[in-house]
């Protein structure tokens, strides 16, 4: 059975946030031999996820402050970064019926996102809400640079949501870690948490923490953050994103 958010796993959002960690530590680009061109996005991801997990709103000022901490390489499209940073909000508002799509679009508009990024955000909301089901079945993957959200979904669909082959191929194409995290999330939403390359297999369980890139977080703290986000999703009302959301 497809593991959509409409039928929550016993592990809640833990596999999803662990997927983000795994993608950032993927072999050949992970700590300690990370290419200098990789954007330092985990700190911004944690800052925003913590705010939403606590029930706080994230308006334009707070969003921009987090975004400004990430220095993207000159040739890297900012759209995947924006989608990844918005992922905690998308998760806690996920619905297979798309009940909150308009609200998230209003939030994106309040941030001044471009029209193309707003379209990508809406597609991403649908993909997450439907458990990664949205995509072009039967399409063949390519190796586009930079990859679009549809390219990510085409890869996931072509490999039937198998996480390890998906990440391996995306890495072979030199997709940046922020894109690996997105494609990994879409794959695990489609196939379920059983396909996650668990951090223990990558040696992450043997570290005291995930290093300064992850603000000294441990995997246990990542799990706690995932549980807090899952609690917001399971609650009676979604987390506010500010006035644009509440309207």
Region annotations inferred by a language model:
Residues 1-247:
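Structured, active/binding-site neighborhoods that engage oxygen-rich ligands
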């Amino acid at each position: 059975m497809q593991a959509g958010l409409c039928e929550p796993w016993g592990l809640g959002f833990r596999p999803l946030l662990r997927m983000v960690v795994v993608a950032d530590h993927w072999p050949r680009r992970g700590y300690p031999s990370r290419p200098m061109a990789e954007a330092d996005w985990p700190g911004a991801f944690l800052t925003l996820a913590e705010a939403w997990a606590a029930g706080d709103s994230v308006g334009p000022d707070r969003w921009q402050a987090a975004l400004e901490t990430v220095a993207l390489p000159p040739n890297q499209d900012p759209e995947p970064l924006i989608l990844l940073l918005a992922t905690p909000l998308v998760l806690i508002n996920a619905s297979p019926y798309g009940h909150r799509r308009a609200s998230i679009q209003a939030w994106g508009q309040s941030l001044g996102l471009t029209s193309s990024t707003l379209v990508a955000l809406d597609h991403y909301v649908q993909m997450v809400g439907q458990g990664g089901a949205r995509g072009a079945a039967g399409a063949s993957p390519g190796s586009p640079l930079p990859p679009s959200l549809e390219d990510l979904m085409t890869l996931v669909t072509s490999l039937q949501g198998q996480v390890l082959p998906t990440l391996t191929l995306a890495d072979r194409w030199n997709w940046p870690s922020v894109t690996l995290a997105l494609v990994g999330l879409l794959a695990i939403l489609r196939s379920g948490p059983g396909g996650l390359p668990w951090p223990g297999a990558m040696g992450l369980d043997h570290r005291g923490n995930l290093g300064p890139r992850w603000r000294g977080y441990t995997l246990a703290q990542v799990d706690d953050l995932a549980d807090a986000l899952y609690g917001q999703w399971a609650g009676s009302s979604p987390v506010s994103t500010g006035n644009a959301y509440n309207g």
